[in-house]
Amino acid sequence: MRNSLLFFIFLPSTILAVDLIHLHDGSPLFGEEVLSQTGKPLTRFQGIPFAEPPVGNLRFKKPKPKQPWRIPLNATTPPNSCIQSEDTYFGDFYGSTMWNANTKLSEDCLYLNVYVPGKVDPNKKLAVMVWVYGGGFWSGTATLDVYDGRILTVEENVILVAMNYRVSIFGFLYMNRPEAPGNMGMWDQLLAMKWVHKNIDLFGGDLSRITLFGESAGAASVSIHMLSPKSAPYFHRAIIQSGSATSPWAIEPRDVALARAVILYNAMKCGNMSLINPDYDRILDCFQRADADALRENEWAPVREFGDFPWVPVVDGDFLLENAQTSLKQGNFKKTQLLAGSNRDESIYFLTYQLPDIFPVADFFTKTDFIKDRQLWIKGVKDLLPRQILKCQLTLAAVLHEYEPQDLPVTPRDWINAMDKMLGDYHFTCSVNEMALAHTKHGGDTYYYYFTHRASQQTWPEWMGVLHGYEINFIFGEPLNQKRFNYTDEERELSNRFMRYWANFAKTGDPNKNEDGSFTQDVWPKYNSVSMEYMNMTVESSYPSMKRIGHGPRRKECAFWKAYLPNLMAAVADVGDPYLVWKQQMDKWQNEYITDWQYHFEQYKRYQTYRQSDSETCGG
């Protein structure tokens, strides 16, 4: 409820009167009336607590709802960010530092921000969009400049909510006990969702139109909420950008999560414990007593390979009942409206961190010819692919054949692009496709986009293309902030299209349909399992050479990752000498045009009898 009592906020040149709001538990708070970067008014609330601080004996536990307060809360200051590491790899380069937390780091970090267009009016019944940030489950905060919700809120007349959740070991340590149940970051998100469902009507929000949207690990989080029966009552639609619960880095088994705890225990010099029959009580006691900075400084000790984040959601039997692939296959998820998509060059950002010998920082912004030959390309690929692929020559050869550039001459840019597509498909695009396809097959309405525009204000080198995460700038309306950025007119129009599609989806479940019943000029078709139509999101001048509506995207490559390669790994044991003979023959045929690698190999296998052994299998 609102109270007629007014609070006056004194700023250097303004005095703004703000109504006091009482939450449904009676807690009073007030925000501030501000202008968007486009000059339109809104009311902003920052730092509203939705949980008790997870400190002391609450560290690693599920969050507890915030107890009511009686003194009016001044919700005009950005909240703390959750404890996390900082990216210093490229020094003070803005392209990397823009993703670092920009407020004080603290374990006391469970707060949310609310943006309301104009003045707060409980009678408005506006659609609500709840943002979940990404960051690999090890970083991220709701207060980043790129997540500033003012422009999206006022331009599309929606309410925007952005919550913090615990990351890294603080949010995802799994010890199979109430003191560290795992998925604490997911429980944080769910508690924030419950807060929204309970209170957003007081801000003018429509409880029947709550849409979750997130990017990367935030998108994986949103899709995990689609899988969890715990979350289903508290949202209605979902948007996933460049991430999915089926991404190989998004969820891990319990035994892996438990092993990580042992490795961290040893790295922190708490003791020397074996992975066989470890004493988890001692491990948990060490972590509970440890300084937060000590935990943060050692959090990466359990990492094994590229794309392996140290602390992520786990199939705990509580929040998550089964692995994501099983849920999708059996239809055990919330069938609703889903908007999903990915970017053209998803993995290049991560490759540069993982391969410093190939992409040295000293030459990063001046060179483009980092990979000049096949030998160096294969070396880089072997440093990036997961172990279960590398341990079998046949599966490695299959991946190399799928992605090795075929057109001659092969340029350094071709080698980089092939590596990027290989890892981008595996870690991002194909998992988003998998989620979209399953949602469609089980009766949900799905819309798919593919972002292909490299922004004029992009600070990363041109050879990196359309990077992971950089659709966010357009969705939150950054190009419209002309006082700070110098985007082109076409890019401002693209940003308007992004915002309109996203807001329409939140309002009506259809990105084409405006709230007044009219439709957008460009028709975005529903995604289906046959034609797999998607909207190519780019500037208008690109369309003559590029189709507005595509099919896939990356459907052939994703069939390789999601169908062919898993079947190959499951079916083939140690292939031994027949493979080597076949490989020699393939080398001789290298200059011939082979239209279907799989067909030729299958023909060859008909005349061979594979030697079976007790050695490790490709699919093990």
Curated annotation (Swiss-Prot):
Task: State any single GO MF term.
Answer: identical protein binding
- Keyword Membrane on this protein? yes
Membrane topology per the record?
Peripheral membrane protein
Cellular component per GO, a single term: extracellular space
Which residues, if any, are the signal sequence?
1-31
Q: Which domain of life is it from?
A: Eukaryota
InterPro entries in UniProt: AB_hydrolase_fold (IPR029058), AChE-related_enzymes (IPR050654), CarbesteraseB (IPR002018), Carboxylesterase_B_AS (IPR019826), Carboxylesterase_B_CS (IPR019819), Cholinesterase (IPR000997)
Glycosylation sites per record: N74, N272, N486, N536
Q: Name one GO biological process term.
A: acetylcholine catabolic process in synaptic cleft
**Where does it live in the cell?**
Synapse; Secreted; Cell membrane
Q: Which SUPFAM superfamilies match?
A: alpha/beta-Hydrolases
Pfam families found in the cross-reference section: COesterase
Q: What class of enzyme is it?
A: hydrolase
Key words, A-Z: Cell membrane, Disulfide bond, Glycoprotein, Hydrolase, Membrane, Neurotransmitter degradation, Secreted, Serine esterase, Signal, Synapse
Is Membrane a UniProt keyword of this protein? yes
Q: Which reaction does it catalyse?
A: acetylcholine + H2O = choline + acetate + H(+)
Q: Record's Gene3D superfamilies?
A: alpha/beta hydrolase
**Paired cysteines (S-S):** C82-C109, C270-C286, C430-C558
Q: What is its EC number?
A: 3.1.1.7
State what this protein does.
Rapidly hydrolyzes acetylcholine and releases choline into the synapse. It can hydrolyze propionylcholine and butyrylthiocholine in vitro.
Q: Which family does it belong to?
A: Belongs to the type-B carboxylesterase/lipase family.
Q: Which PANTHER family match?
A: ACETYLCHOLINESTERASE, ACETYLCHOLINESTERASE 1
Record text on subunit structure and interactions: Oligomer composed of disulfide-linked homodimers.
Name listed for the protein in its UniProt record: Acetylcholinesterase 1
